[in-house]
Regions:
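Conserved Rossmann-fold NAD(P)-dependent oxidoreductase catalytic core, especially the SDR/UDP-sugar
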Residues: 94-138
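Substrate-positioning beta->alpha
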Residues: 145-146, 174-179, 193-217, 226-230
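Amphipathic terminal alpha-helices
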Residues: 3, 300-308, 312-333
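NAD(P)H-binding glycine-rich loop region in Rossmannoid oxidoreductase-like domains
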Residues: 44-90, 98, 118
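Catalytic helix-loop patch of NAD(P)-dependent Rossmann-fold dehydrogenases
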Residues: 90, 121-168, 189, 197
Length: 333
């Protein structure tokens, strides 16, 4: 039975991928810094490892693996470029080197659409769009560099592919879903520009579907080898529709407050200045990058991922919101 290594399995996406692999009978090893007791209880192995630390430790953690799903990353909108580079570029370079050292045949990398979002509207872009991350986002800059490393590593011994899931949400999400709900409960949620711009998020099960398809389809010389693919639900909707859908699932009223894009951008600039001045490490309520993201459209064509990986995005937005509401009712998350 093949051994699949999953990095970042304590996170929302990595954990969901690991559970799906275990459910279908794969041998799974979770490699990361924090323990994953819930996944160990399901049969996963666990190796504690700082992927940006010593190369020898990373090589040992990947020993015996047939495939690696590299999901681990430092995400978010706050932190130094050096912090993001260490977690996202250095760690990825060491994962690639460890794959080569151990003769791993397949590497699936979790990237982000932010690698092509320079700050303006992105409507219906496909994978021919050049890498052009917004320099205001250390995360996007570091992920673009890491994706480039992964795609360049594709050769006759190691097949690689990068996936770019967009705005992952669903039960258990501590980022997008949890922040929308928390800010609404605190009376701090605003729709930038009225929430009219189109976005296309990814329900968690669809993100998992794409990763498992990539794992199964990826071989040396396969159509997907060396490529990157956008992943989403395939249902662009106004931002307010998704936001208010999440609020309704949590039993909260829709967001009726808005803020002009220019005002959000100025607020972000001021908060960034204050945060830098105080040396704070927590994320500000607004940054210039977030203001740009919320004030622009960003949705992508899925023709390539459907053609090469057989991706369907089986859970549509309405069904995802129904499942989210059920989760809030039963577990509160």
């Amino acid at each position: 039975m093949a051994l699949v290594v999953v990095t970042g399995a304590s996170g929302f996406l990595g954990g969901a991928i690991a559970r799906a692999l275990l459910a279908r009978g794969d041998r799974v090893r979770c490699v990361q810094r924090s323990d994953v007791a819930d996944l160990r209880a399901l049969g996963a192995d666990f190796v504690r490892c700082d992927l940006s630390g010593g190369a020898a430790a990373v090589q040992a953690a990947l020993a015996g693996a047939d495939a690696v799903l590299h999901v681990a990353a430092k995400a978010g909108v706050w932190g130094s470029q050096e912090q993001f580079d260490a977690a996202n570029i250095t760690a990825t370079a060491q994962v690639i080197a460890a794959c080569r050292h151990n003769g791993v045949a397949r590497l699936v990398y979790t990237s982000t659409p932010s690698v092509v979002h320079s700050g303006g509207d992105v409507e219906g872009a496909d994978e021919s769009a050049p890498l052009h991350p917004d320099p205001r986002s250390a995360y996007a800059v570091s992920k673009a560099a890491a994706e480039t490393l992964v795609r360049a590593a594709n050769d006759q011994r190691l097949a690689t592919v990068a996936l770019r899931p967009h705005l992952i949400w669903g039960p258990g999400d501590t980022q997008l879903t949890a922040r929308i709900v928390a800010r609404a409960q605190a009376g701090r949620l605003r729709l930038v520009g009225g929430g009219d711009k189109l976005i296309d998020g990814t329900y968690i099960d669809n993100a998992v579907e794409a990763h498992l398809l990539a794992l199964d389809r990826l071989t040396v010389g396969a159509p997907c080898a060396g490529r990157a693919y956008f992943v989403a639900n395939g249902e662009p909707v106004p931002q307010r529709v998704l936001v208010n859908g999440i609020l309704a699932a949590a039993g909260l009223p829709p967001c009726g407050k808005g803020i002009a894009p220019w005002a959000a951008y100025v607020a972000g600039a001021i908060l960034e200045w204050i945060w830098h001045l105080l040396g704070r490490e927590d994320e500000p309520l607004m940054t210039r990058f977030v203001a740009r993201q919320l004030a622009t459209a960003h949705w992508y064509r899925l023709d390539a991922v459907r053609r090469d990986l057989g991706y369907q995005g089986k859970v549509k937005t309405d069904e995802g919101l129904r499942r989210l509401a059920q989760a809030f009712q039963t577990t509160g998350v």
